[in-house]
Amino acid sequence: MTSSKRAADRADQADIQAVSRVSQILSLFDPATLDVTAAQVAERLGLNRTTAYRYCTSLVAAGLLERNADGGYVPGGLLLQLGAFAIGHRRVINLAPRHMQALSRATQNSAVLCLWGLTGPVVSRVEENPSTIVVVSVRVGSHLPLDTAQSKVFLAYHADQLSMERLMATLSGPALDELRTEVARVREVGHCAAMSTPGVVAVAAPVFDEYGICATIAIVGPDNTLSMSDDAPELRVVVSTARELTKELGGHYRPDGPE
């Protein structure tokens, strides 16, 4: 191998590493982390502060980050523009609101639509029911953990089952065994009810477009009013809503069997 070839290979590897590092930095943001400092980036990613600062400065120049009044970094205009563009061009986002409003009214609970993010469901739209005294809701943009009903539905029906298995393998012991059992049950019955937060029940079903699962639709409510039973009337409404939205998207509702 010539020296010029080796130099080119090293440059390619450096470019790939830089892209990976940028992804890691942007992944630090979530609903609980609205801004970060270069010191926090360095600590969380195992970088020295000079390198972290250099990355953050470059991302500001590219429009992916911005400086706030406190000197920290927040998502930049280009990132927000791309995010809005990506979400806005998901057909399910445009078609779901009418179905979610009807679902919320019919069940007297908040309706929640989730799309699949990098490593799990992301809350993309919420329709609250204002007629109830106690409103249980969830913030748009929240990343849901693996033990939620929405996660289990995605794990059951996602097209890339190898990646789903790797994701589940981040757990171990009884927690992993329990999750695999529950995901298998979702494939069998076509829906999931779970209480991942004490006192709060979520009942979820999959939504499909022509390519496969594209979202989950769910209701969330207090455990003293929202049943986790397979014959609960609220569950029937959730499944019916998921089936109707799937039909409107041109998909096949897989829990109903083969096409």
Residue ranges and their predicted role:
Residues 15-19, 76, 89, 93, ...:
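Short, structured helix-loop boundary elements
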Residues 175-247, 251, 259:
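Extended hydrophobic
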Residues 2-87, 93, 243-251:
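N-terminal helix-turn-helix
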Residues 28, 44, 95-106, 110-112, ...:
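Amphipathic alpha-helical regulatory segments at dimerization interfaces
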Residues 71-167:
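Amphipathic alpha-helical effector-binding/dimerization core
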Residues 66, 112-114, 194:
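Conserved beta-strand cores of small sensory beta-sandwich domains that regulate signal transduction
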